A protein has these predicted regions:
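The feature captures the beta-strand-to-loop junction immediately N-terminal to the Walker
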Residues: 42-44
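Catalytic Walker B motif of ABC-type/P-loop ATPase nucleotide-binding domains
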Residues: 156-160
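Helix-to-loop junction immediately C-terminal to a conserved catalytic motif
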Residues: 57
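Conserved ABC ATPase signature
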Residues: 131-135
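Conserved ABC ATPase "signature" region
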Residues: 98, 102, 110-127
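Conserved catalytic motifs of ABC-family nucleotide-binding domains
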Residues: 152
């Protein structure tokens, strides 16, 4: 399925005590998504990413412009964000998925087959019988994504799906979801304010900034994939392992964890992360070491 957005505008009416004001959120958005594309959409909080997804989903109407789906009159969407509140917390994950599968019109056999397939790819087999309320944030998000894929969608929309997750949980969700999309040839729009995440999963990139959408090629994203641009958090006992391999700068100490940056300007982030895995060091968090990546990209 091919998606086209043509000359899309979106305004909202903001009411205050004295008057109504028009607030422009999106202006002249033009976008083409081909079959099998995964578009990484970068933008700060409030840039309009969620608004754009809602327009594509048909939840809100654009002020002007058109949304065109070729080959599909009534496409099926998959959608996942970082909010787990739409699940039933006291029943098991499998019972949740069965309920939502029935809402999608799937038969019991189709639901079981879909859950089995998704369990293998997303690694959720061990938690299917666990009440949803007992899951970690990362596990909840895996179930959230499984729900969005229960019935193979024509287009998957992901709105900051790894927000608030630790590095390991984020990496697992990114890698498993990308594998499933590729295997099943499902196009997707993956929204985030984290360019590292988008660079791992996407073959196309775009930036929402100042109400407008701009395509960007992956080389611009990769240019900033140097370890020196990040601050890392690890537990105290792992710092000495890292010091044996690299020249680092300790930036702060919080409880039993230490934060540091690397000094090597030429060390790629991926190479650095592979080194940490090799020496058995687990990253607790990674933060960008400059103010706003969007200001550097274009």
């Amino acid at each position: 399925m091919k998606l086209e957005l043509k000359n899309l505008y979106k305004d909202f009416t903001v009411r205050n005590f004295f008057q109504k004001e028009k607030k422009s959120v999106l202006e002249d958005i033009n976008l083409t998504l081909e079959e099998n594309d995964i578009l990484g959409l970068l933008g700060r909080n409030g840039a309009g990413k969620t608004t754009l997804l809602k327009i594509i989903l048909g939840l809100i109407h654009p002020t002007k412009g058109s949304v065109i789906f070729s080959d599909k009159k009534d496409p099926l969407f998959g959608f996942a964000n970082s909010n787990p509140r739409s699940f039933f917390w006291r029943i098991s994950c499998k019972e949740n998925l069965i309920f939502f599968g029935k809402m999608l019109g799937l038969t019991s056999k189709e639901i079981d087959e879909s859950i089995d397939k998704l369990s293998d790819i997303l690694g959720i087999s061990d938690i299917l019988d666990t009440p949803f309320m007992l899951l970690s944030s990362g596990q909840m998000q895996s179930i959230n994504i499984a729900r969005s894929l229960l019935k193979k969608p024509d287009l998957l929309l992901l709105d900051e799906p790894t927000t608030s997750l630790d590095y390991e949980s984020s990496k697992r969700i990114i890698d498993t979801t990308k594998e499933y999309l590729k295997e099943n040839k499902i196009p997707a729009i993956w929204c985030s304010h984290d360019h590292l995440e988008l660079n791992r999963v996407s073959n196309k990139f775009g930036l929402l900034k100042n109400k407008r959408f701009t395509f960007s090629n992956s080389k611009i994203f990769k240019f900033h994939q140097k370890a020196i641009n990040y601050e890392f958090e690890v537990i105290n006992k792992d710092i000495d392992k890292i010091k044996l391999k690299l020249d680092i700068q300790i930036t702060k100490l919080v409880n039993i964890n230490q934060f540091f940056t690397v000094k090597d300007k030429n060390l790629d982030l991926d190479e650095f992360l592979r080194l940490l895995i090799k020496i058995d060091v687990k990253i607790i968090s990674i933060e960008k070491n400059f103010n706003h990546f969007e200001d550097y990209i274009l």
